Amino acid sequence: VSAVILTVTPNPSVDRTLDVASLVAGAVNRANGAHVEPSGKGVNVTRALAANGVRSRAVLPIGGAEGDQLRRLLEEESVSYVAVPVTEPVRVNISLRTPDGVVTKVNEPGPILSWGEADALAEAVLAHLGHGDWVVGAGTLPRGVSDDFYADLAERVRLAGGRFALDSSGAALRKGLAGRPALVKPNLDELAELTGGTLPTLDDVLTAAAKVRRTTGTDVLVSLGEEGAVLVGDGPPLHARVGKPVRVASTVGAGDNLLAGFLAVNGPPAHRLREAVAWGTAAVRSPRSLAGAVTDDDRAVVVLA
């Protein structure tokens, strides 16, 4: 395992989940409970790794009172982080959860970063990068940051002897692939958007992933929800999934946990893919976006399809 897995989350958040008995538009809805946690895709990868004893450090822009709160939340979980100071405040995302498990989300757009702040974010990653380390670039890009941010960073990480994993969407994902990351982790919708079609069958998914692999040289790890995940890399394509039904508590953060699991272990691709699906499964079983420790029970249910 590499010395430290770095993550960079250009648009992190403080996530507040409110439990409401019911949700009525235009009325006063009273919450009977609230839960606050640090969030953002890269932050979640680092949290998952830290919870399983794997060294990871989150690099993120932090500004405003919300940024101070984000720091405190990370420190409460003993998550190692590098704060890049920015002028505008970190965003707050609100989730409203009804007893039937349905979640309604309202996400703030987040800060506008200056060119200098975006550059400082990239420089902070490179300053903490050791040879052979993984860097995970994850999530949406905040306003003010070029769509080429991940592509540029991937290239710089590669030239510095590191390995870059990309987990984003839209233009940031499409353009990010130009930086030839070592790994990309789209979900089904993101892969479909990337390859310009619908992907109704597993064969379609494998064909689309192979197309991305062929055109970019990047290994492709596709998260498929209850169908597990596929990996298209150097060797034959692989598919791992859970062999029996799993009680779903929350799908939030499952893809982030899956990516964390893949990066947490060394060994043959099939072993890493099985570990990835085990971590994703642990996340789905947990009501929070953070799964906590992955157990042998989580691993036992994963089969190579």
Predicted regions and their residues:
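Glycine-rich phosphate/adenosyl-contacting loop at the front of the ribokinase-like
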Residues: V1-V59, P245-R247
